[in-house]
Curated annotation (Swiss-Prot):
The keyword Ribonucleoprotein applies. This is Large ribosomal subunit protein bL34. The keyword Ribosomal protein applies. GO terms for biological process: translation. Belongs to the bacterial ribosomal protein bL34 family. Pfam families: Ribosomal_L34. GO terms for cellular component: ribonucleoprotein complex; ribosome. InterPro entries: Ribosomal_bL34 (IPR000271), Ribosomal_bL34_CS (IPR020939). The gene is rpmH. GO terms for molecular function: structural constituent of ribosome.
Amino acid sequence: MKRTFQPSNLVRKRRHGFRARMATKAGRKILNARRARGRKSLSA
């Protein structure tokens, strides 16, 4: 059977990248939460 995780850097960036996060209000909320928490990496 086909595995569920088929890695693709392009899809990864488009779906979870910084620009994708900044594009929506909810995404900006995620980034702010990760900043507040002191995450080293904010997004993919």
